[in-house]
Amino acid sequence: MDGTFLDHLGAYDKARLDNLLDACEAKDYVFTVASGRALLALEELFDGFVDRIAIIAENGALVQYKGEVLFESKLEPKDYLQIADTTLSLPTCEGILLSGRRGAYAPNDADPAYLKAMERYYENVMATDLEAVTDDIFKVTAKFQGDTIMERGDYLNTIFEDMTAVTTGFDSMDIILKGV
């Protein structure tokens, strides 16, 4: 959505969207937002419109229509903890985040600057003991030094056969269940 639907400030014309939704509804079209962002962040961004749109969040791991969850693909704790440990051990990894239904979780020792930067894309960002997380987790996001991201993605795709690492288009990678 950055650089397409959203302007350089990360905003959009709400009156224009309202008019567009009226036109879509008149033709029985469904306006759908598709993003790698978390559902909470998208609900916040589209506040006032959630009951009129479909949202495909978390790179497809969570689908909601008019506020009702239609599909979700959650990671098991053993899987996201293994992904987190492996990813954090890579020399060019600058931070990881577990993206959940109620918030986003980074390790206790996460760089505060990384947490602050992630607040642009996630709601309720917090540093915590990842083993104590009880939220539903849909993906693991990892930030890498820019020139190593493709190499790291290939590596992660090799060692986690049931997962897929996809670039976010910037210097981060989302790791989700394969087939999502």
Feature names for model-found ranges:
Residues 1-11, 33-35:
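Asp-based phosphoryl-transfer active-site loop
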Residues 4-5, 62-63, 171-173:
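A short, flexible beta-alpha/helix-coil linker loop
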Residues 6, 43, 153:
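A short local structural element in Rossmann-fold oxidoreductases
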Residues 6-8, 29, 70-71, 139:
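Short, contiguous strand/loop micro-motifs
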Residues 9, 34, 72, 175-178:
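Glycine- and other small-residue-rich loops at beta-strand/loop junctions that grip anionic moieties
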Residues 10, 76, 145-146:
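Short beta->alpha junction loops/turns
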Residues 14-113:
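Active-site phosphate-binding/coordination module
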Residues 93-180:
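Conserved acidic, metal-coordinating active-site core of Asp-based
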